[in-house]
């Protein structure tokens, strides 16, 4: 609805009907996508899974903070490996501290097992006829697995409602803002408008382009691409090579900050996803 000012703020059925009629005649309303009942259910399930992932992350932070407070330091290279977990279980703090650590580790185990079970269920949901083909296409991109692909599909719905890839990137808030006055133009950070959840997923996926050789395809990526048409695989390979090359150019040649480069890659990844979902892959 257009903003109303002055006397036009008076609301009656007759005035409202007149305004709605004018807006419809002049095409001032933007079309919206009404998600199906199935999409809504899957979306809620995926967000529930992400809530558990966030809870697991917080428990990990609490365990590490507990060890730091009591001067327990792990000599290994990485946390949350099998060696690190065995080390945590072998600790013998005094008195009540042992019980505290055991409760933390129990919560960690419960959440880890639940996430594993939920991820298996997500694989089953993605295998449904209504999602299988679309999920398979999106999984051809580096950093995009079943959970991310299915989340983007049910969160966005109909990709064809966006006239261009730029419109889709704008919808999820990955385009830069602008503050213009007269002849002066000032570029701002990304708008962060629209669907925050999709933006977060694509930003996380873009981190995978910060490592690995340009043009290299891992065994896991080849397995995900298996079963798709040669045209789909070629389009995804072109996107993967371009995005990885652009990331290295921004960071190494232009000395851009890593987060700035990752956000730029996330925006282009969104554009390539739009092309994949609307069959603009020529």
Feature names for model-found ranges:
Residues 1-282:
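A detector of single, family-specific signature residues
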């Amino acid at each position: 609805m257009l903003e109303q000012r002055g006397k036009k703020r008076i609301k009656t059925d007759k005035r409202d009907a007149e305004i709605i009629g004018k807006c419809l005649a002049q095409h001032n309303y933007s079309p919206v996508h009404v998600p199906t009942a199935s999409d809504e259910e899957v979306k809620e399930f995926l967000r529930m899974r992400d809530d558990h992932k966030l809870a697991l992350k917080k428990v990990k932070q609490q365990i590490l903070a507990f060890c730091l407070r009591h001067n327990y330091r792990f000599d290994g290279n990485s946390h949350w490996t099998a060696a690190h977990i065995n080390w945590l279980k072998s600790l013998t703090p005094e008195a009540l501290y042992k019980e505290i650590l055991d409760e933390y580790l129990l919560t960690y185990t419960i959440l880890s097992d639940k996430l594993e079970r939920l991820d298996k269920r997500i694989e089953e949901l993605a295998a449904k006829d209504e999602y299988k083909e679309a999920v398979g296409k999106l999984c051809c991109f580096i950093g995009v697995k079943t959970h991310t692909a299915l989340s983007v599909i049910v969160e966005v719905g109909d990709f064809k409602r966006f006239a261009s890839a730029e419109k889709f990137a704008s919808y999820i808030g990955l385009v830069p803002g602008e503050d213009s006055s007269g002849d002066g133009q000032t570029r701002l950070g990304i708008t962060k408008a629209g669907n925050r959840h999709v933006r977060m997923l694509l930003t996380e996926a873009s981190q995978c382009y910060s490592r690995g050789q340009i043009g290299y395809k891992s065994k896991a990526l080849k397995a995900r691409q298996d079963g798709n048409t040669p045209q789909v695989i070629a389009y995804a390979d072109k996107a993967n090579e371009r995005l990885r090359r652009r990331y290295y150019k921004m960071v190494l040649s232009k000395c851009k900050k890593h987060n700035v480069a990752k956000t730029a890659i996330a925006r282009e990844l969104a554009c390539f996803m739009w092309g994949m979902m609307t069959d603009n892959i020529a």
